[in-house]
Amino acid sequence: MKLSDYVVDFLHEKGIKDAFLLAGGGIMHLLDSIAKSDINKYYNLHEQASAFAADGYGQFANKPALVLATTGPGATNTITGVASAYIDSIPMIVITGQVKRADITKINGVRQTGGQEIDIVSMAKGITKYAKT
């Protein structure tokens, strides 16, 4: 079993029935695992649409939906929808991709070397109950 299979199974067992997402390389293993699951998948053309769809879903169903977005700009595109849900106390789970720790460039002082690095956790901490890498 892959870790991504475990994550998807865990979320499904905890009651996640629906996921809003846009495919991207930073979440490819989760995409493969969710494709095999019983979780309903709603593919959007923009990550912000996924976050707002999950916000609307949470308002209607009173339970969290899952949002999946890839690294860098994919993750930052969810921020407005996440903030909207946070302000209205709407449940939502957002999982974004991240570059490998070995590829993170903060260690060598370079801003970016092509991995679409963004410190999404720092951006999300003020508008979420929990944000972690």
Q: Where do the protein language model's features map onto the residues?
A:
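N-terminal alpha/beta PP-like core and its mobile active-site loop of ThDP/TPP-dependent enzymes
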Residues: M1-T133
